[in-house]
């Protein structure tokens, strides 16, 4: 019962102090700690995935019931707190349904220039390190249509959806022997709700969950 109450609280309330192509790995590049045996991390990652990814992205090759079974989240908790989509009649989807959203392909193309991709297999296609550093390296660029750019994927059409958590940062450049500039690190210009270490841990949880999506038979 205590475990169940703690889990419901984690799903109900926001975490406190709580994607194609790529650039070269810079000095800022770090590898996440992927651990599919860390159930608490996977549960936190599922919450982040729902709250910050699923408005635009799907994981349509994965079913909610697998999330419930594999991550030890009761089906009623999943249905009440993680599933927000409905069928054509307006009835809320249940735990047996696929992890879809309500965004149409046409709307995605109009809003972002191309429809946001499904994320079920992204960790297998790109690798955990790519996703982790992509999520951490959005930086302010006023000339961009989204107001930001990304060190891993220059010209990314995705806005900085994690800005409330991370805040906004600017790149710090170093110069090589040929005079070419490279991003060395980042400095915060606006603090988010999390400290840098807290944000890194949260993104590690999210990456952990995305690795699970592509490798459910663990």
Each language-model region and where it sits:
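The canonical Cys-X-X-Cys-His
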Residues: 49-60, 206
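Bacterial N-terminal signal peptides that target proteins for export
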Residues: 1-7
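Electrostatic cytochrome c docking/interface patches
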Residues: 21-47, 58-69, 214-218
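Stable alpha-helical elements in mature extracytoplasmic
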Residues: 41, 48-49, 115, 127-131, ...
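Short glycine/proline-rich turn/loop motifs
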Residues: 26-29, 182-191, 210-212
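N-terminal signal peptide c-region/cleavage motif recognized by signal peptidases
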Residues: 14-16
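Electron-transfer interface patches adjacent to heme c in soluble/periplasmic c-type cytochromes
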Residues: 73-151, 156-177, 184-199
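Juxtamembrane amphipathic/hinge helix adjacent to a transmembrane helix
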Residues: 196-218
């Amino acid at each position: 019962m205590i475990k169940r109450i703690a889990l419901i609280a984690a799903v109900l309330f926001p975490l406190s102090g709580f994607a194609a192509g790529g650039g070269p790995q810079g000095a800022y590049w770090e590898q996440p700690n992927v651990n599919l045996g860390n159930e608490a991390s996977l549960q936190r990652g599922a919450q982040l995935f729902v709250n910050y990814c699923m408005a635009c992205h799907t994981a349509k090759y994965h079913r909610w019931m697998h999330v419930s079974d594999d991550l030890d989240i009761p089906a009623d908790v999943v249905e009440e707190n993680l599933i927000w989509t409905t069928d054509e009649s307006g009835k809320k989807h249940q735990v047996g349904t696929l992890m879809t959203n309500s965004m149409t392909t046409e709307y995605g193309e109009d809003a972002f220039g191309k429809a946001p991709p499904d994320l079920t297999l992204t960790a297998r296609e790109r690798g955990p390190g790519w996703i982790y550093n992509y999520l951490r390296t959005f930086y302010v660029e006023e000339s961009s249509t989204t107001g930001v750019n990304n060190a891993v994927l220059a010209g990314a059409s995705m806005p900085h959806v994690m800005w409330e958590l991370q805040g906004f940062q600017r790149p710090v450049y170093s110069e090589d022997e040929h005079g070419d500039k490279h991003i060395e690190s980042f400095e915060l210009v606006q603090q988010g709700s999390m400290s840098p270490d807290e944000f890194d841990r949260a993104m590690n949880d999210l990456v952990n969950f995305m690795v699970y999506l592509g490798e459910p038979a663990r």
